[in-house]
Amino acid sequence: MLNDIEVLSKPDTNYWTSTAYRVPDVPNHTVKPGDKGFRLIPVTSNAPRSFITNVQNGDKLKVRAETLVRGIAFGGDCGVARVDTSIDDGKSWQPTQLGPDEGKYSLRQRQTQFTLPAGGARTLMARCTNTVGLAQPSFPVWNPSGYLYNTIESTHVIAT
């Protein structure tokens, strides 16, 4: 519950705003582990992200049977425009059905149905694109604090 709001006439100097919530001032705020000499800036926005919530790594899914995959997504600092799902390790993507839009900062439920055509190991992926066109990247965003990590999540399953 919100108890009070404090309005400041200058930037806050508490630990969280002056030291903790900071990322490298470089494209995508990503650096290599061990890199030094970059300027840090405050985190002022968030990045789109999507999760698969009803299928776990190692699950066995039936071949040639309809499979429902559910999840959630958020657009970061704006709304969710779309979520796409891949059943072939990101080689192809299909649109996902989105649940109600409860506002630009809310989580959106999502679901999609698919049929696995053959047996074997499969990688399921979900990729969110927000309303300003920013999509989750396929590469990891790494920085010393771990903020703004939004790489496309992978769920490894076995088709049987």
Enumerate the language-model features and the residues they cover.
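Extended, aromatic/histidine-rich regions of cofactor-dependent oxidoreductases associated
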Residues: 1-160
